[in-house]
C-alpha cells in the first residue's frame, strides 16, 4: 500500500476552512513584513480568479439544465405551501440585503477604469439589456460570460429535453457532476489563492482594504441574523399563529450549528431529517421538502449575491433607482435557487447580478475574489441560515395544516 507524503496527508486531513484561515493569516503577515514578495504572490490570486472565471459560465449552464431535466413529473408532494415559504423567504432576504446595502454602503478595492464602465440609465435600459442578453447566441453567451443568456439557454434546453431518453439524461447529469468536480478542485486551491489575493491587496492598498472587508462582513452577517431572528419568525407566526421563537431556536440550535461547521446544505440533510422526525412531521412531506430546500431555499445565498453586487455598484459610483433595486432582488432570488450543491456557488453567481448594472465580468470576478477572502465566516453563516430554514419552513407549513403537531412537537408553545 502506497504511503501518502506527510504534507499531503496533513492537507487532506485539514478542513478547507482551516486552510483558508491559514492562507488569510499568511497573506496578512506577508504584506506586513515582505511587501515586495506579497505583490509577487498576487500571481497565485490571479490564477485562482482566472480559474473561477473559466469554469463559472459552464457551471451555471450545465447545473441549471441538469436540474430541470432531472425533475420528476407527476410526483405528488403537496409542496405548494412549503415552496411558497421557500421563495418568499429567499425574496425577503434579497430585499433586506438591498435595504441594508443602501443604509450601510460598502466600498471595495477593485482594479477598474471607470471610463470603461457605462452604468445603465434606469430600469428601462436594464430590461432592454436583459432582453437582448436573453436572445444571444449560446456559444457567444458562454464565451462572453453572459449569465442571463446562459440561464435562458439552460432553462430552454432543460425544458426541451425533459422527454429525452434516460441515457441522454444520464449523460447530462454525469456532465454536471464532472463540472462540479472541477469546481471542487478549483475551490481546493482557495487557500493559496486567498493568500495571494490578501497579500497583494494589502501590499498595494494598505490595511484600509481589510477594514473595508470587515464592514462588508458586518453587513452580510447582520442581514443574515436579521432574517434568522426577525423575518423568519414573522413568516412562521403568519403560518402557525403562535409564538414562533421556540421552533426557530430549536431549528437554529439543532440544524444551524452543524451546518455552520459543515458549510454544506447537502451534508446537513441527514441532520434536518432527524430533526423533522423529532418534530413528528409527516415523513412523506419532509422526505421531499428538505432535499428540495437544500436546492432552492437559499436566503443566505440571496443576501450574499445582493450585498456583494451592491458593494460593487457603490464602489464604481453608480446610482441605482428603486425599480432596478427591486429587479436585483428578483434576480438574486432566482440566482440563489441555482447556487446549491456547489462550493462557493453563491459567489460564482455574483457576475450574473452585476451584469444588470453593466459591470464587466473581469470586475465582477474581483468581487467574487473578495467574497472568498471573507468566505470563512460568510459561507458558514450562509449555510447555517439556508439549511436551518429548510426544516423551519417545512415544520411551519406542516403545523399550519395539522395543529396537533404544535402540541406534539418537543418545543414549548406560547400558550403553555
Swiss-Prot record:
The chain crosses the membrane at residues 15-35, 49-69, 82-102, 141-161, 192-212, 217-237, 288-308, 316-336, 363-383. GO terms for biological process: serine transport; threonine transport. Pfam families: SDF. It is found in: Cell inner membrane. InterPro entries: Na-dicarboxylate_symporter, Na:dicarbo_symporter_sf, Ser_Thr_transp_SstT. One of its GO terms (cellular component) is plasma membrane. It catalyses: L-serine(in) + Na(+)(in) = L-serine(out) + Na(+)(out); L-threonine(in) + Na(+)(in) = L-threonine(out) + Na(+)(out). It is a multi-pass membrane protein. Keywords: Amino-acid transport, Cell inner membrane, Cell membrane, Membrane, Symport, Transmembrane, Transmembrane helix, Transport. GO terms for molecular function: neutral L-amino acid:sodium symporter activity. Involved in the import of serine and threonine into the cell, with the concomitant import of sodium (symport system). Belongs to the dicarboxylate/amino acid:cation symporter (DAACS) (TC 2.A.23) family. This is Serine/threonine transporter SstT. It comes from Aeromonas hydrophila subsp. hydrophila (strain ATCC 7966 / DSM 30187 / BCRC 13018 / CCUG 14551 / JCM 1027 / KCTC 2358 / NCIMB 9240 / NCTC 8049).
Amino acid at each position: 500500500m502506497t504511503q501518502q507524503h506527510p504534507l499531503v496527508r496533513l492537507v487532506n486531513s485539514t478542513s478547507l476552512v482551516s486552510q483558508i484561515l491559514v492562507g488569510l493569516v499568511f497573506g496578512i503577515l506577508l504584506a506586513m513584513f515582505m511587501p515586495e514578495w506579497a505583490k509577487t504572490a498576487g500571481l497565485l490570486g490571479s490564477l485562482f480568479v482566472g480559474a473561477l472565471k473559466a469554469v463559472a459560465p459552464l457551471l451555471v449552464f450545465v447545473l441549471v439544465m441538469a436540474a430541470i431535466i432531472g425533475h420528476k413529473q407527476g410526483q405528488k408532494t403537496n409542496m405548494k405551501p412549503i415552496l411558497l415559504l421557500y421563495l418568499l423567504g429567499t425574496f425577503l432576504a434579497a430585499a433586506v440585503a438591498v435595504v441594508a446595502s443602501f443604509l450601510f454602503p460598502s466600498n471595495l478595492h477593485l482594479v477598474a477604469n471607470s471610463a470603461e464602465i457605462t452604468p445603465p440609465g434606469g430600469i428601462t435600459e436594464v430590461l432592454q439589456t436583459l432582453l437582448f442578453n436573453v436572445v444571444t447566441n449560446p456559444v457567444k453567451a458562454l464565451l462572453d460570460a453572459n449569465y442571463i443568456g446562459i440561464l435562458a439557454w439552460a432553462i430552454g434546453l432543460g425544458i426541451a429535453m425533459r422527454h429525452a431518453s434516460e441515457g441522454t439524461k444520464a449523460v447530462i447529469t454525469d456532465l454536471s457532476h464532472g463540472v462540479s468536480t472541477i469546481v471542487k478542485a478549483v475551490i481546493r486551491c482557495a487557500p493559496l489563492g486567498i493568500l495571494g489575493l490578501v497579500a497583494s491587496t494589502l501590499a498595494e492598498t494598505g490595511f484600509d482594504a481589510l477594514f473595508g472587508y470587515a464592514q462588508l462582513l458586518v453587513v452580510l452577517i447582520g442581514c443574515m441574523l436579521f432574517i434568522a431572528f426577525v423575518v423568519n419568525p414573522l413568516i412562521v407566526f403568519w403560518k402557525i399563529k403562535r409564538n414562533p421563537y421556540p421552533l426557530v431556536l430549536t431549528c437554529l440550535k439543532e440544524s444551524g450549528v452543524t451546518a455552520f461547521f459543515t458549510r454544506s446544505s447537502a451534508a446537513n440533510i441527514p441532520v434536518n431529517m432527524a430533526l423533522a422526525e423529532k418534530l413528528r412531521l409527516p415523513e412523506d412531506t419532509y422526505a421531499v421538502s428538505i432535499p428540495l430546500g437544500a436546492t432552492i431555499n437559499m436566503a443566505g445565498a440571496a443576501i450574499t449575491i445582493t450585498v456583494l453586487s451592491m458593494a460593487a455598484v457603490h464602489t464604481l459610483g453608480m446610482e441605482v433607482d428603486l425599480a432596478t433595486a427591486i429587479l436585483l432582488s428578483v434576480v438574486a432570488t432566482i440566482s440563489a435557487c441555482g447556487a446549491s450543491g456547489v462550493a462557493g456557488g453563491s459567489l460564482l453567481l455574483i457576475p450574473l447580478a452585476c451584469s444588470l448594472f453593466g459591470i464587466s465580468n473581469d470586475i465582477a470576478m474581483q468581487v467574487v475574489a473578495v467574497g472568498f477572502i471573507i468566505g470563512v465566516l460568510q459561507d458558514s453563516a450562509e449555510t447555517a441560515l439556508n439549511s436551518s430554514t429548510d426544516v423551519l419552513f417545512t415544520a411551519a407549513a406542516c403545523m399550519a395544516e395539522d395543529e396537533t403537531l404544535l402540541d406534539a412537537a418537543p418545543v414549548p408553545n406560547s400558550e403553555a
